[in-house]
């Protein structure tokens, strides 16, 4: 144990945070409710070109990974994507993507894609019917297995998937490819889980286990590479950059991040994957490229392990009469300085001006775990009354689950809300970000003021960014404002995102690294003998603890829980990995051993890493897997 982590700080939960709320609200929702919420979202809430079915599918897959009920995912997935055999929802996804990217398939390619959609849904429907007939036979004699149908369906998937990877349209077709990959990987998982009931031989079962690993690798790498190629070509305003990322996360990476977890069963995924939203006001004209993204990303993520309570800042409203004695006036509302506040008295650095007294405070009012923020308004613009009077407005407003609102100014314009997502962090940028900041990403929990270059007209202004994710199984706040993770009451497995640590030593050499295939981002250690501590509220169950790590070089992992130390030496994932290249990380899931999450107790979990080769180490996921449900590969 590092002395840094034994510096006298004790873990005490804030009593006011332990209130009646449902930390497993997503798991308790029915699929019908989820579908209705996404339909309502599309109807009333968002201008983003996203078909609501994409949100329903990601929620469905997360619920299936977290459940033992129903082993035939493909049958249910077909009903969601192709209701009554219709391809309309898949065509909706394509039309929405065409509008968002301002690109269209040519006539011949569109006809080809539509024909593939019709063929794909018909193939899956026929396969599902064959399985139904096998399980409820009307013919005699009853076939001993359905292997022939399984192998035929496998080949049909292999024939059809390339039709959604057409040269010149890879990005445009990526959301359709992701849905087709969802169905293919669900099919393979179904074969593995139903092998006994379907009469699948041991040899065929081994083949399909290999298929699950190999096609998870291939499809993940294709999606990541296609997205990154497009992202590297961006040179645009922050709003447009974040909107592109959010669009691709909803349509593609919500699925990619689940695929690598398909090998687990009954694993409740506590996601740390974020959606970002910002305003589209005309004042923010600074352009950003992919080279600037590491800094921006670190700014938005730096305090993700704290429990958000609100913001404070300086809002100004100034009216100037028109010059020369002409009638009319110009009124300007602006947020000129902002600070993000968290439980435990923790605050971020200042955004915008650093020398102004704050004159407003926006908080959840009620305990932040009970009533977190879920919606933001971040736009700005200009209203004109006639030809002589104008008002430059700005919003920076937020709403809780109880519809309580607060902010710098009144809510107006487009709102940012996603079903089952909470605003777990708020960040922001000044009018212009200094070059010296753009080249220096923030380290873990760094407090740094972010301001415009001296002398920039309007440089005092701040523009906020809301950070949305699904993380909800939070028991309480530690004394230092970080989250205590809550284990499920039953024997369901669960995950902890590594970025949601209680505390970390060597912070100046620890960074959050963006990941796409992992249900959240990694904690990157660049200094040896670094320890990350996590706190969880136990349930008394025994689990196999798996750590998803990337170690390009030899490392030693020491895990301490309940006074017991587990050591794994010579960890090197350079070649021994799952094959996915996730933004430079090549990961493998390491079985640390059997642990017990003590019942009704705050349990500390310390993960210490020694870098024997001096190379960076990514801690990508912490998984508590039921002992009776080993991974499928």
Swiss-Prot record:
Induction: Transcribed starting in early sporulation and into later stages; not expressed during vegetative growth. Third gene in the orf1-orf2-cry2Aa (cryB1) operon. Keywords: Plasmid, Sporulation, Toxin, Virulence. InterPro entries: Galactose-bd-like_sf, Pest_crys, Pest_crys_dom-III, Pest_crys_dom_I, Pest_crys_N_sf, Pest_cryst_cen_dom_Cry2A/18, Pest_cryst_cen_dom_sf. SUPFAM superfamilies: delta-Endotoxin (insectocide), middle domain (SSF51096), delta-Endotoxin (insectocide), N-terminal domain (SSF56849), Galactose-binding domain-like (SSF49785). GO terms for biological process: sporulation resulting in formation of a cellular spore; symbiont-mediated killing of host cell. GO terms for molecular function: signaling receptor binding; toxin activity. PANTHER family: ENDOTOXIN_N DOMAIN-CONTAINING PROTEIN-RELATED, PESTICIDAL CRYSTAL PROTEIN N-TERMINAL DOMAIN-CONTAINING PROTEIN. Belongs to the delta endotoxin family. Toxic segment of the protein is located in the N-terminus. Promotes colloidosmotic lysis by binding to the midgut epithelial cells of both dipteran (Aedes aegypti) and lepidopteran (Manduca sexta) larvae. This is Pesticidal crystal protein Cry2Aa. It comes from Bacillus thuringiensis subsp. kurstaki.
């Amino acid at each position: 144990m590092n002395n840094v982590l034994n510096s006298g700080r004790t873990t005490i939960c804030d009593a006011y945070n332990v209130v009646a709320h449902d930390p497993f609200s997503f798991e308790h929702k029915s699929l019908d409710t989820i579908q209705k919420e996404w339909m309502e979202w599309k109807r009333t809430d968002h201008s983003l070109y996203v078909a609501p079915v994409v949100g329903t599918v990601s929620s469905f897959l997360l619920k299936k990974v977290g459940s033992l009920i129903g082993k035939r995912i493909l049958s249910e997935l077909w009903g969601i994507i192709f209701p009554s055999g219709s391809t309309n929802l898949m065509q909706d996804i394509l039309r929405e993507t065409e509008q968002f990217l301002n690109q269209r398939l040519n006539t011949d390619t569109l006809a080809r894609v539509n024909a593939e959609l019709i063929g794909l849904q018909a193939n899956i429907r026929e396969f599902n019917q064959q399985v139904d007939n096998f399980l409820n036979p009307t013919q005699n004699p009853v076939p001993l297995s359905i292997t022939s149908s399984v192998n035929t369906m496998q080949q049909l998937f292999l024939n059809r998937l390339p039709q959604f990877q057409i040269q010149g349209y890879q990005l445009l077709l990526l959301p359709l490819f992701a849905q087709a990959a969802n169905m293919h990987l669900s099919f393979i998982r179904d074969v593995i889980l139903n092998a006994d009931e379907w009469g699948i031989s041991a040899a065929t079962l081994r083949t399909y286990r290999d298929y699950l690993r190999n096609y998870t690798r291939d499809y993940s790498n294709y999606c990541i590479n296609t997205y990154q190629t497009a992202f590297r070509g961006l040179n645009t305003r922050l709003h447009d950059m974040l909107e592109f990322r959010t669009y691709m996360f909803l349509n593609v990476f919500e699925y990619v991040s689940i695929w690598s977890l398909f090998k687990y069963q009954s694993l409740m995924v506590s996601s740390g994957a974020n959606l970002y939203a910002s305003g589209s006001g005309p004042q923010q004209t600074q352009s950003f490229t992919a080279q600037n993204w590491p800094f921006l990303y670190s700014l938005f993520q730096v305090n993700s392990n704290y429990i958000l309570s609100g913001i404070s800042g300086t809002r100004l409203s100034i009216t100037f009469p028109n010059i020369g004695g002409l009638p009319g006036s110009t009124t300007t509302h602006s947020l000129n300085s902002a600070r993000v506040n968290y439980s435990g008295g923790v605050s971020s650095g200042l955004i915008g001006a650093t020398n102004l007294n704050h004159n407003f405070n926006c908080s959840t009012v009620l305990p932040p775990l009970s009533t977190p923020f879920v919606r933001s308004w971040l736009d700005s613009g200009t209203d004109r009354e006639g030809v002589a009077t104008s008002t430059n407005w700005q919003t920076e407003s937020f709403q809780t689950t109880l519809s309580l609102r607060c902010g710098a100014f009144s809510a107006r314009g487009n709102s940012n809300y996603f079903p089952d997502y909470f605003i777990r962090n708020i960040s922001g940028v000044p009018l212009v970000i200094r070059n010296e900041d753009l080249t220096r990403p923030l380290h873990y929990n760094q407090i740094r003021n972010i301001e415009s270059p001296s002398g920039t007209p309007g440089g005092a202004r701040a523009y906020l960014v809301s950070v949305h994710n699904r993380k909800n199984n939070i028991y309480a706040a530690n004394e230092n404002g970080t989250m205590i993770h809550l284990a499920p009451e039953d024997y369901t497995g669960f995950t902890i995102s590594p970025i949601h640590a209680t505390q970390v030593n060597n912070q100046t050499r620890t960074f959050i690294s963006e990941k796409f295939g992992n249900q959240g981002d990694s904690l990157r250690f660049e200094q040896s003998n670094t320890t990350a501590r996590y706190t969880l509220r136990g349930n008394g169950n025994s689990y196999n603890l798996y750590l998803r790590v990337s170690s390009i070089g030899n490392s030693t992992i020491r895990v301490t829980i309940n006074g017991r130390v587990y050591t794994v030496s010579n960890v090197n994932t350079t070649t021994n990995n799952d094959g996915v290249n996730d933004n430079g990380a090549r990961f493998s899931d390491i079985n640390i051993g059997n642990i017990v999450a003590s019942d009704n107790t705050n349990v500390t979990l310390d993960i210490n890493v020694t870098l024997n080769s001096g190379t960076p180490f990514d801690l990508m996921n912490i998984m508590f897997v039921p002992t009776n449900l080993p991974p499928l590969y």
